[in-house]
Amino acid sequence: MQDIRSDWYIIGASAIIMSDIKIGKTSDIDILTTKEGADEWRIALQEYMELNLVTKEGDLFRSKFSRFKLPLIDIEVMGGLQVNKNGKWKDVLVSDFHQMPVGDTIVKIPTLNELERILRLFGRDKDLKRLALIAKQQQQYS
Protein backbone atom coordinates (compact mmCIF):
# COMPACT_ATOMS: atom_id res chain seq x y z
CA MET A 1 0.00 0.00 0.00
CA GLN A 2 3.04 2.25 0.18
CA ASP A 3 2.91 2.52 -3.64
CA ILE A 4 -0.52 4.14 -3.48
CA ARG A 5 -0.08 7.91 -3.51
CA SER A 6 -3.68 9.02 -4.06
CA ASP A 7 -5.96 9.63 -1.10
CA TRP A 8 -8.04 6.62 -0.14
CA TYR A 9 -10.51 5.85 2.62
CA ILE A 10 -11.99 2.71 4.11
CA ILE A 11 -15.78 3.06 3.92
CA GLY A 12 -18.76 0.79 4.39
CA ALA A 13 -19.04 -2.00 6.94
CA SER A 14 -15.31 -2.17 7.64
CA ALA A 15 -15.20 1.52 8.53
CA ILE A 16 -18.24 1.14 10.77
CA ILE A 17 -16.64 -1.82 12.56
CA MET A 18 -13.36 0.11 12.91
CA SER A 19 -15.41 2.91 14.51
CA ASP A 20 -16.36 0.48 17.33
CA ILE A 21 -19.93 -0.03 16.12
CA LYS A 22 -21.03 -3.65 16.36
CA ILE A 23 -22.74 -4.57 13.10
CA GLY A 24 -21.50 -8.13 12.72
CA LYS A 25 -18.94 -9.39 10.24
CA THR A 26 -18.03 -8.21 6.77
CA SER A 27 -16.72 -10.19 3.82
CA ASP A 28 -14.74 -7.35 2.26
CA ILE A 29 -13.05 -4.01 2.75
CA ASP A 30 -14.46 -1.14 0.67
CA ILE A 31 -11.94 1.47 -0.47
CA LEU A 32 -13.00 4.86 -1.84
CA THR A 33 -10.37 6.66 -3.90
CA THR A 34 -9.88 8.70 -7.06
CA LYS A 35 -9.79 7.19 -10.55
CA GLU A 36 -6.00 7.57 -10.46
CA GLY A 37 -5.97 5.88 -7.06
CA ALA A 38 -7.96 2.97 -8.50
CA ASP A 39 -5.20 2.51 -11.09
CA GLU A 40 -2.58 2.55 -8.32
CA TRP A 41 -4.47 -0.16 -6.41
CA ARG A 42 -4.71 -2.24 -9.61
CA ILE A 43 -0.94 -2.08 -10.04
CA ALA A 44 -0.17 -2.73 -6.36
CA LEU A 45 -2.52 -5.73 -6.06
CA GLN A 46 -2.53 -6.93 -9.66
CA GLU A 47 -1.85 -10.57 -8.77
CA TYR A 48 -5.06 -10.67 -6.69
CA MET A 49 -7.33 -8.81 -9.12
CA GLU A 50 -10.53 -10.57 -10.12
CA LEU A 51 -10.91 -10.63 -13.89
CA ASN A 52 -14.15 -10.52 -15.90
CA LEU A 53 -15.82 -8.74 -13.02
CA VAL A 54 -19.59 -8.30 -13.12
CA THR A 55 -20.87 -5.57 -10.81
CA LYS A 56 -24.32 -5.34 -9.34
CA GLU A 57 -26.26 -2.16 -8.74
CA GLY A 58 -24.88 -0.48 -11.86
CA ASP A 59 -27.98 1.66 -11.98
CA LEU A 60 -27.15 3.06 -8.52
CA PHE A 61 -23.34 3.23 -8.52
CA ARG A 62 -20.63 3.88 -11.06
CA SER A 63 -16.87 4.01 -10.55
CA LYS A 64 -13.57 2.61 -11.70
CA PHE A 65 -14.22 -0.63 -9.80
CA SER A 66 -11.91 -3.51 -8.95
CA ARG A 67 -12.14 -6.49 -6.63
CA PHE A 68 -9.07 -8.16 -5.19
CA LYS A 69 -9.26 -11.68 -3.75
CA LEU A 70 -6.67 -11.67 -0.98
CA PRO A 71 -6.10 -14.74 1.21
CA LEU A 72 -7.91 -13.36 4.27
CA ILE A 73 -10.45 -10.91 2.86
CA ASP A 74 -11.57 -9.34 -0.41
CA ILE A 75 -10.87 -5.69 -1.12
CA GLU A 76 -13.22 -3.69 -3.35
CA VAL A 77 -11.84 -0.43 -4.73
CA MET A 78 -14.09 2.28 -6.12
CA GLY A 79 -12.30 5.08 -7.95
CA GLY A 80 -14.30 8.25 -8.56
CA LEU A 81 -17.43 6.69 -7.07
CA GLN A 82 -20.75 8.27 -7.99
CA VAL A 83 -24.25 7.46 -6.77
CA ASN A 84 -27.41 8.00 -8.80
CA LYS A 85 -29.89 10.15 -6.88
CA ASN A 86 -33.11 11.08 -8.67
CA GLY A 87 -31.55 10.52 -12.08
CA LYS A 88 -28.44 12.62 -11.38
CA TRP A 89 -24.96 11.27 -10.67
CA LYS A 90 -23.42 12.68 -7.48
CA ASP A 91 -19.78 12.30 -6.49
CA VAL A 92 -19.19 10.41 -3.26
CA LEU A 93 -16.52 12.32 -1.35
CA VAL A 94 -15.23 12.13 2.21
CA SER A 95 -14.95 15.54 3.85
CA ASP A 96 -14.28 14.57 7.48
CA PHE A 97 -12.12 11.65 8.58
CA HIS A 98 -9.69 10.41 11.17
CA GLN A 99 -6.55 8.35 10.78
CA MET A 100 -5.92 4.99 12.39
CA PRO A 101 -2.82 2.78 12.44
CA VAL A 102 -3.33 -0.71 11.02
CA GLY A 103 -0.09 -2.67 11.08
CA ASP A 104 2.54 -0.57 9.31
CA THR A 105 -0.05 1.53 7.50
CA ILE A 106 -2.07 4.58 8.51
CA VAL A 107 -5.60 4.33 7.12
CA LYS A 108 -8.21 7.06 6.76
CA ILE A 109 -11.72 6.38 7.99
CA PRO A 110 -14.65 8.78 7.72
CA THR A 111 -15.93 10.07 11.05
CA LEU A 112 -19.11 8.44 12.28
CA ASN A 113 -21.15 11.49 11.21
CA GLU A 114 -19.57 11.28 7.76
CA LEU A 115 -20.27 7.54 7.55
CA GLU A 116 -23.90 8.22 8.43
CA ARG A 117 -24.10 10.87 5.69
CA ILE A 118 -22.68 8.42 3.14
CA LEU A 119 -25.07 5.66 4.24
CA ARG A 120 -28.03 8.04 3.85
CA LEU A 121 -26.74 9.04 0.40
CA PHE A 122 -26.54 5.37 -0.69
CA GLY A 123 -29.99 4.71 0.78
CA ARG A 124 -30.16 0.95 0.21
CA ASP A 125 -31.92 -1.30 2.74
CA LYS A 126 -28.61 -2.53 4.16
CA ASP A 127 -27.43 1.08 4.56
CA LEU A 128 -30.60 2.06 6.41
CA LYS A 129 -30.23 -0.98 8.70
CA ARG A 130 -26.66 0.06 9.48
CA LEU A 131 -27.84 3.59 10.25
CA ALA A 132 -30.35 2.16 12.72
CA LEU A 133 -27.64 0.05 14.40
CA ILE A 134 -25.36 3.08 14.70
CA ALA A 135 -28.17 5.17 16.21
CA LYS A 136 -29.10 2.40 18.65
CA GLN A 137 -25.53 1.97 19.88
CA GLN A 138 -24.99 5.71 20.17
CA GLN A 139 -28.11 5.95 22.37
CA GLN A 140 -26.78 3.18 24.61
CA TYR A 141 -23.53 5.08 25.23
CA SER A 142 -24.97 8.57 25.66
Kindly give the residue locations of the regions a language model identified.
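Compositionally biased terminal segments of proteins
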Residues: 1-142
